């Protein structure tokens, strides 16, 4: 029985069949298939999946089931993101937290339930804050490796600068940082009962506003810098049951105040006076941004805690020098006996000084009584959040942008110490300050100080570390291991109120001006930029109630003036005098570059401050005889017992001069000459920008005076014998007349004075003469000192005087004095202002002077062994220059040969590819043309049959005619395309032929140049000994051979080899091998010498003078290991296309 065709060839679409239907279900689901964490799945742009594994040793991504390597930059993950191969973390990373009540709890079924989740190894708790124990709210039980997330909105931006490992978790919104949920046993009473006396109040408990901070905990409970665990505020409350004052404790989720950021003082202001108790300050505050409105409302409605002050403090807290300055002091080493003192005097003294953690003992002689608390007045502006402060007795140091500044990393920058080596001072400097908010600081904060005395306005400024401008700031310090400055007490600046200012008082505790800085901290207790755990200022106040000194806390980013670097000298002037005390100096300064125009305007209007400098120096610094010079001094050895006076004063704004690791020395009348360390002293002329310098070191000293007279002095400790060296000038050529009495004895004193009266010589001749004289003096003293300074003297009656005096260590000192009748800058020794032409002429003159020295020795009949190939003619330099030039030329030629070959091959390849494409396209067009032609023939026949059938219904003549027209259009279009392609093919073929011709011409030119280089190098190898040996007798017998004659002989010698082939040159070299001629050439290999002569058959003969490659720029970066790559030239031959 025959089978049906359809049953045999059954049409089935196997492509749509599931794989399970073909191979069966390979996975039955009974056994667990373990996923390999080392294998990932990635997808390409088309959605194709790939298995990816990573080889850690080779750094290659590959197919774990094959040998294929992948580029993961072209792959994506399942979400369409760029693929990243992250190895799976260990599964039991978080199992170690199971059972920890901080991460969850067990339910009634005994199953562990997490109270949050981990995100990037950071624990994020979703559990609402509940009062569990005394340490509620603190993460003291968290292990150190668990990192806390940043707060979102409840931290009020205070912990933005904390490191990630100590970030506080999110706090609950309805807690607002207060102790509403504290346990009953540590709850504080809401109303104020009778407050104890001020002494007991300060001694037993901290202030209520900052209550809850552990700033001044004892050292044994001090928390480390980056440890998460810290004592809770509840423990702090429990430890002080004696206090009945209404205390406000912030929630544990709020960040603790660090060294650099104002914490809660932006919202609650302290005001401690001498004779009144501390009371909370009520503030007008509406709709505060951090949710303090409810608390403030409670404060306003509480009649029992109304402030007794007569004035109010504003909520903007621009003043950081209110009664309690928002500054925190780190522990200071007990070995530090002296600390830098900054004290201020005001009409009232409304502050309590914060003491050091370790050295916290207060001198019993100075325990002022708390007398009166000034009135605090607060006002809050909702619209522009610009707050004002009225404190006649306080100095403002906060800005209206301080809230933003707390989030800035600049507030956590390292402190710049007042002195780099923990300098201290023995006397205090009194400030009488008044200031206004300044809004143009670069770091976005208003730094101001206010005082009713209107005596001084001084602001610490943040400067750039490289170009730190000077500031008018008067400080006095006694640096360790440096020159000590004795400053006597000033009788003019008197404090407005009595204030303890004893040396012992300030020696044992930190002063308020410098409070908050870690200048004197030992290295082991230095805090990093971002410190979490800071002791509470409240505990600090509790331990030290005796102090009433007004405290200043400068911003952490503000550098302090140091003695080593130009720091604040443009705004604060140093005046360390022996018999005068420092006084603030006012300065005229407009439009200063760091935004101090407003401050300087206030200083200009201040009439009470007068500069203490006796003389005023203009900004051009033309006169070095003035008392004050804008200069800086390097550290001086401790052995230097003399005292140095630093003083400066300016009529107009001085131009700030940038120093690059260079310090300048003060021209001081009271300071003896220091010769142990080289010091550079520079001054900048603002008008004509001519820089004059004084150099002082162990060898040379250049000083500028008022006359056009140059005096060079070298000293020796032995007796002095004057010696005069006459010099004559003949045809711009200097000849020395030998002096017979030139015997120099080191045991005897010698002072040589050479006076040169320049009558008819120009400035260049005198400059050359100066160098000659210095060299002559050095040669006479067997020294090797060479000066390269150029002295320009334009007057004919200028006088040059050279005094040489050698020191005990046989090192001569050269002092050059230019005494000019004209202004100094016209005849001064300028630094880095000489032209290249003057330098080259001076070098040539020095070379000639060496030649004349040899001539003088030869004339004296001395046998000079230095008369040789190199000493007279300096042929070694010539040979080395020739070698280097040839190396560079060869290097360039080789690179250029490779470059043109590469360009040619690229163009040739592209044109050949285009030719192949056009040929293939024409073949396809020919096929289309033939098909269209056949179709047209069929359509014509069909139309003829239609016409022959009398237009039967089955035929449609109209459609046949339209199809015939379309076929004709297709034929014409294809024919035009074929014609255009043929034209392109013909043009490309012509271009290829022309390209080949031009390339061959370029290769011939390059080979010709290589041939010239090879032959020239051969000449350079052979010309050394044969030529010079033949002329050496004439050199020694007849004297000097003119350089022009030497060059002519060299050229004549080389011309004899112009037409010699390479084989003949090799034979010549072989014949002269017995003469020990060195034919080896450094930097070249044998490939360069062994050039195939067949390649150079088409090249014409040449001479040394016809090198036409001097315009080529050498390329020193290429490798010329294979100079001639003949295979590269051969590989770029003709081509053929079959079409």
From Swiss-Prot:
Where found in the cell?
Cell projection, Attachment organelle membrane
* Segments of skewed composition (Polar residues): 241-250, 404-424, 545-554
Q: For bias kind Basic and acidic residues, which ranges apply?
A: 427-443
Give positions of region: Disordered: 128-266, 369-570
Q: Which GO terms describe its biological process?
A: adhesion of symbiont to microvasculature
Question: Which superkingdom?
Answer: Bacteria
Could you tell me which cysteines form disulfide bridges? none
Its keywords, alphabetically, are: Cell membrane, Cell projection, Coiled coil, Cytadherence, Membrane, Virulence
The annotated regions of Low complexity compositional bias extend over 389-400, 445-458
Where does it primarily localize?
A: membrane
Matching InterPro entries: Cytadherence_HMW-1_N, EAGR_box, EAGR_sf
Which cellular components does GO assign to this protein?
A: attachment organelle membrane; cell projection; plasma membrane
Please describe what this protein does.
Component of the cytoskeleton-like structure which stabilizes the shape of the wall-less Mycoplasma. This cytoskeleton-like network of accessory proteins containing HMW proteins 1 to 5 allows the proper anchoring of cytadhesin proteins in the mycoplasmal membrane at the attachment organelle.
Q: Provide the protein name.
A: Cytadherence high molecular weight protein 1
